[in-house]
Amino acid sequence: MSSSGAMPAVSSTSSSAAVGILSATTAKTKTKKKHFVQQKVKVFRASDPLISVLMWGVNHSVNELIQVPVPVMLLPDDFKANSKIKVTNHLFNRENLPSHFKFKDYCPQVFRNLRERFGIDDQDFQVSLTRSSPYCESEGHDGRFLLSYDKTLVIKEISSEDVADMHIILSHYHQHIVKCHESTLLPQFLGMYRLSVDNEDSYIIVMRNMFSHRLTVHRKYDLKGSLVSREASDKEKVKELPTLKDMDFLNKSQKVYVDEEQKRNFMEKLKRDVDFLVQLKLMDYSLLLGIHEVFRAEQEEEEELEEDNAENECSPHVNVGSYGTSPEGIAGYLNSHKPLGPGEFEPIIDVYAIKSSDNAPQKEVYFMGLIDILTHYDAKKKAAHAAKTVKHGAGAEISTVHPDQYGKRFLEFVTNIFA
């Protein structure tokens, strides 16, 4: 396709099917607004060109997939497939999109199938990622970590090695999800992409947010079942929501209060998932635990309402789902249902959430799931294990152990987090 007027020149290749584009590239730019509102014309406005390219690419990718029939079954080639597009952008929306960029969608049919299995409609997925710009939650040595504007999706920057590891485990992961009928604590992988801007490649994986898009998390733990070097640093502890670790959990005498049936269901899922990770020789994963305090949240909401009334203006962040602001997107499901009260959640959306038991000291909601599952027990880990054994002694509780030992120790630790 050649460039004419305000249209970008596009060349597209796909390992499965090649179809038309241009649903997102045919109109004028709208005036910039502060609030999260739907842009009738998709201009993919973001402060970072990379995020604009991600929004553009996801929009294009989903529009293409909608035109391709859903296969009766996935074939081995689908787990190696990709769809690529190269865009030369002269005039259209040039204040937001780079003049040249490339977008690659890995295994589109596989992730489409996973989204369907996890109860996420493709168009809701598209809206949640493209209606308004995602915002940066944190940035560290592991890359950026973003949330979709409606807080239902996590967008994580990963390495090319992570992409290779995902390709190795993807068919096993898919098989596991099918086998357990989507009843899992593993991350829900929903899409994986490569963005190329200014001759630099960035790799992105999209997952369901383990925390609620609606209920605030007041305490957060990353638990591995290891006690060596597993305490949050002083620098971490002064953050508004620090990521606390195993030693912090024990030192604070923290407990998770759920009834016996919920505990049994949770541990069944966890054991099944950990067995799967051990079989693939994966390790270094963590249990992410988020705690929502219901009474504290009610107090905070009252204070916010008082502030809002005093200022008589809307907050720049829309609490999607709480007040029914989005007719679409993943959180849009809530709008056809009655409003949720304090500490209530919709299990279809907050799939990792568990309510505290009636005999808990205070009313809480827990969000628990497995994260960082891509570390393979390779030569690097073996070397690290040898070094740590020399430093701490053979019997020390160190995190770098064989996958079998890691899984066993992890399950033992998590069993004991419950009251």
From Swiss-Prot:
The keyword Endoplasmic reticulum applies. Phosphorylated, phosphorylation is induced by EGF. Its main location: endoplasmic reticulum. It comes from the Eukaryota. GO terms for biological process: 1-phosphatidyl-1D-myo-inositol 4,5-bisphosphate biosynthetic process; phosphatidylinositol phosphate biosynthetic process. It catalyses: a 1,2-diacyl-sn-glycero-3-phospho-(1D-myo-inositol-5-phosphate) + ATP = a 1,2-diacyl-sn-glycero-3-phospho-(1D-myo-inositol-4,5-bisphosphate) + ADP + H(+); 1,2-dihexadecanoyl-sn-glycero-3-phospho-(1D-myo-inositol-5-phosphate) + ATP = 1,2-dihexadecanoyl-sn-glycero-3-phospho-(1D-myo-inositol-4,5-bisphosphate) + ADP + H(+); 1,2-dihexadecanoyl-sn-glycero-3-phospho-(1D-myo-inositol-5-phosphate) + GTP = 1,2-dihexadecanoyl-sn-glycero-3-phospho-(1D-myo-inositol-4,5-bisphosphate) + GDP + H(+). Phosphatidylinositol 5-phosphate 4-kinase with low enzymatic activity. May be a GTP sensor, has higher GTP-dependent kinase activity than ATP-dependent kinase activity. This is Phosphatidylinositol 5-phosphate 4-kinase type-2 gamma.
